[in-house]
């Protein structure tokens, strides 16, 4: 019997009310959603041609939390996108703190030939690296706080395989956290 359903990612513009309803109705659908936002600044999102605003993004999350309070989120962030100001970055940090993403995959913008942003003036590398480090430290703190809440709790794990170590098994919880358990069974 199929125990869990998980899908990798969805674009915010494709996250319809119908999909939100599926999250409510399908108990096997895991309560972790990877919903790439890229930035907390509407200015940067527009420059990236992302087709969603922060307000629309937050509205999706509000609807999801309303129908499934245990839902958690992960996201992708591009730090140092051309034209990103200190204020734009602070808006991204503010979003991170507000949503408390349990996983935040963050990277410094890198120019790619053939893309509209390729010829735009890049953010100074030193500033971009400082911002990324700041952002990742905040992300780590949020993730640590989240994981502390799991300590001493009994949670369902779907085991995937045995590890190389004798009597240890690898699995994941419903929020896709890795778990290793020692057992003689």
Regions found by a protein language model. Name each.
Residues 23-25, 92, 121-124:
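Short, hinge-like loop/turn segments at secondary-structure boundaries
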Residues 35, 76, 96, 104, ...:
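Hydrophobic, well-ordered secondary-structure elements that form the walls
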Residues 14-18, 37-48, 79-86, 102-128, ...:
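Flexible glycine/acidic-rich beta-alpha junction loops that bind and position SAM and/or redox cofactors
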Residues 119-185:
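Terminal RNA-binding accessory module
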Residues 1-86, 97:
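Conserved SAM/AdoMet-binding glycine-rich loop
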Residues 57, 89-92, 128:
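Aromatic/hydrophobic pocket-lining residues that form the small-molecule binding cavity
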Residues 30-32, 72-74, 101-102, 152-154, ...:
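Active-site lining segments that contact anionic ligands and/or coordinate catalytic metals
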